[in-house]
Amino acid sequence: MATTKYYGTGRRKSSVARVYLVPGTGKITINKRDIDEYLGLETLKVVVRQPLVATETVDKFDVLVNVRGGGYTGQAGAIRHGIARALLQVDSEYRPVLKSAGFLTRDPRMKERKKYGLKAARRAPQFSKR
């Protein structure tokens, strides 16, 4: 028996998350590890669950995630984006709720490149008057 899988791709900074929603009990698995084991900070766990809480589907789906690149914050944002996109495949009536909360928008903010003559993107070398 083939169970229905709903797929969504999420991106944030340099992280890319491939998210699958499977009808289940609400278990979230990231890179074959439980969410509590993978994400240490409670705030990141809240970020990941936001789309499910907004659409009141926390205990209706198991979330399987494969995420690569970036740090934990970027990965949590990418997972949130992916879950929101996958929820649209489940039911398109979730769109107004997810859109108003801003979960469907790809956050365009990226790391600014380092410029030559400077120590970092904008940090200049110390100025000496004399």
Curated annotation (Swiss-Prot):
SUPFAM superfamilies given in the database record: Ribosomal protein S5 domain 2-like
**Keywords assigned by UniProt, alphabetized:** Ribonucleoprotein, Ribosomal protein
Alphabetized GO MF terms: RNA binding; structural constituent of ribosome
Q: Name one GO cellular component term.
A: cytosolic small ribosomal subunit
Task: Note the InterPro entries from the entry.
Answer: Ribosomal_Su5_D2-typ_SF, Ribosomal_uS9, Ribosomal_uS9_bac/plastid, Ribosomal_uS9_CS, Ribsml_uS5_D2-typ_fold_subgr
Which Gene3D superfamilies does this UniProt record tie to the protein? 3.30.230.10
Biological processes per GO annotation: translation
NCBIfam families, per this entry?
A: PRK00132.1
Family note? Belongs to the universal ribosomal protein uS9 family.
**Name of this chain's protein:** Small ribosomal subunit protein uS9
Q: To which species is this protein native?
A: Agathobacter rectalis (strain ATCC 33656 / DSM 3377 / JCM 17463 / KCTC 5835 / VPI 0990) (Eubacterium rectale)
